[in-house]
Amino acid sequence: IASHATQSTWTFYTMEKFKWNEKMVGYSLGFVGLMIAIVQGGLIRIVIPKLGQKKSIYIGLTLYVIGFVCFAFATKSWMMFAFVIPFSLGGICGPALQGVMSGQVPANQQGELQGALTSLISVTSIVGPLLMTNLFSYFTAADAPVYFPGAPFLMGAVLTLFSVLFAVRS
């Protein structure tokens, strides 16, 4: 659900807070894509074997929290580009987490595990955008108790922090 803070509100947030136009949003999303490609396409193969899966999960989730908080409180347009870097590096946690889960399930149940994970992602793809766009709308409305367009990112940080705590306990 936390990831939908970025996926669902990036455009709204950057246009509201920094007055970005469609072209600038496009550049920023292109940069996000480039960073994700670097992490997913190469860095994971280096980092996860060196750190191990569990440490990669903790570090990745922590980097996501840092990224979310930085996005929420960014004050200058350029900061969004800078903060994409730690946020994207958080992507090391996904493959590490899948590796840990796959290691806990026998070979004949791998398909069931992957199906369950896909179903879970589908559910979060329903709940996440609704939650995050409504938070954004609430905190940017004229009658909002406090103007805070970064609220969805802060919610993303809180939800991811719960994931960190859950990962540490298990």
Which residues make up each language-model segment?
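A membrane-interface helix-boundary motif in multi-pass transporters
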Residues: 134-160
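Short amphipathic helix-loop junctions that connect adjacent transmembrane helices
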Residues: 8-28
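Loop-to-transmembrane helix entry/capping segments in MFS-fold secondary transporters
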Residues: 22-23, 105-119, 146-149
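Helix-loop junctions at membrane interfaces in 12-TM secondary transporters
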Residues: 71-84, 93
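Structural signature of the two symmetry-related core transmembrane helices
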Residues: 55-70
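Intracellular juxtamembrane helix-capping segments at the cytosolic ends
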Residues: 92-106
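A late C-terminal transmembrane helix in Major Facilitator Superfamily
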Residues: 110-140
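Helix-to-loop junctions at the C-terminal end of transmembrane segments
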Residues: 39-53, 136
